[in-house]
Amino acid sequence: MIGMPPPHFSLERQILSYYESGQEAERLESPFFRWEKVRTLDLLERLLPPAPALILDVGGAAGAYAFPLAEKGYVVDLIDPVPSHIEQAQKRAAMGQRVPRSFHVGDARAIPCDNGVADAVLFFGPLYHLTDSGERMKAICEARRVLRAGGVLLAVAISRFASALDGITRGLIRDPDFVRIVQQDLKTGQHRNETGNLDYFTTAFFHHPDELKTELIEGGFPNPRLCAIEGPLWALPESATAEQQEGFMAIMRKLENEVTLIGASAHIMGIATKPND
């Protein structure tokens, strides 16, 4: 149950400007990034409890995953800190039938929901846009609060090595300004783009895989496991037949839990279950 409006939190200006520009919707539909969405949907199908479980999609943008889940019979509450994302989702919902139950402007650090009601919480954004570790811990503890015992948190991080690998794959590494961004990413995990080039992303924190696991444990989720989302698939050519794509997916399912390869994935999913207290 969605409750009273939470305390006010604000996104950093650069992050809000990036998403208000419509970059996220365009990115997920672009050929180069398609594997992120395809693989995420594949993982959700395998990791979520059966419908009609209640899912809180926190930081879910305009509903890239909330709508497909609602179509499968899940009860989905979509929460995002970017007002235009919620407006886009509401417009889309007006044209559909099986759509998310509710849409709210809100923040992962103060989820507008009662204690212990959610079967699953999706964090597909909050952990990399909360650049301070204390703020990330607030969000993780909030996820634990709203989950029922046995509920699952699926929390996505961007890999510490994502910019370096992206730069090599797409040739961005030829730009000295991009090289400087990569150097800071590798040193501190703090991704800062002062170039004005939106292709270089926006303000974020890039996790080392071990950091993601540690944060989940410290937030009250014992024994989390990590899973590579795209893995090496993001380096594949843009065109592939349906048969080839299925072959790629079968390989990735074999590689997704390989510890030595998880950091080579642009996105890493932390899978954590709330214990019985």
Predicted regions and their residues:
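A short acidic, Gly/Pro-enriched loop at the edge of an enzyme's catalytic core
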Residues: 109-121
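A short glycine-rich, Lys/Arg-flanked "PGG" loop and its adjoining helix->strand segment in the class I
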Residues: 137-149
